[in-house]
From Swiss-Prot:
Function in brief: Forms a proton-selective ion channel that is necessary for the efficient release of the viral genome during virus entry. After attaching to the cell surface, the virion enters the cell by endocytosis. Acidification of the endosome triggers M2 ion channel activity.
Domain remark in the UniProt entry: Cytoplasmic tail plays an important role in virion assembly and morphogenesis.
Main location as per UniProt: virion
Annotated HAMAP family: INFV_M2
Phosphoserine PTM positions: 64, 82
Intracellular or extracellular location(s): Virion membrane; Host apical cell membrane
Regulation: The M2 protein from most influenza A strains is inhibited by amantadine and rimantadine, resulting in viral uncoating incapacity. Emergence of amantadine-resistant variants is usually rapid.
UniProt keywords, alphabetically: Disulfide bond, Glycoprotein, Host cell membrane, Host membrane, Host-virus interaction, Hydrogen ion transport, Inhibition of host autophagy by virus, Ion channel, Ion transport, Lipoprotein, Membrane, Palmitate, Phosphoprotein, Signal-anchor, Transmembrane, Transmembrane helix, Transport, Viral ion channel, Virion
Site (Essential for channel activity, possibly by being protonated during channel activation, and by forming the channel gate and the selective filter): 37
Residues carrying a glycan: 20
Protein name (database record): Matrix protein 2
GO MF, any single term: monoatomic ion channel activity
Covalently lipidated residues, kind S-palmitoyl cysteine: 50
Amino acid sequence: MSLLTEVETPIRNEWGCRCNDSSDPLVAAASIIGILHLILWILDRLFFKCIYRRFKYGLKRGPSTEGVPESMREEYRQKQQSAVDVDDGHFVNIVLE
């Protein structure tokens, strides 16, 4: 019987599986992989904003600031932070002149 068509049905007042090959190592491995996939999917949906922002902005190295005055460094940091803050919302209003 296929994994897709197995249904748990009441058998003698107990819940059980009608298939006889449930102790098959392949079925056990598929179950473990399915559970891990579900856990990873849930974590991805819970933390997607943190995860993808980290990949988008955190892994990029900015330009070298060697020889740049501190005031210009601070201005650059503020621009980078404002770019990250814009990404917080789902919609961004763009005004064309």
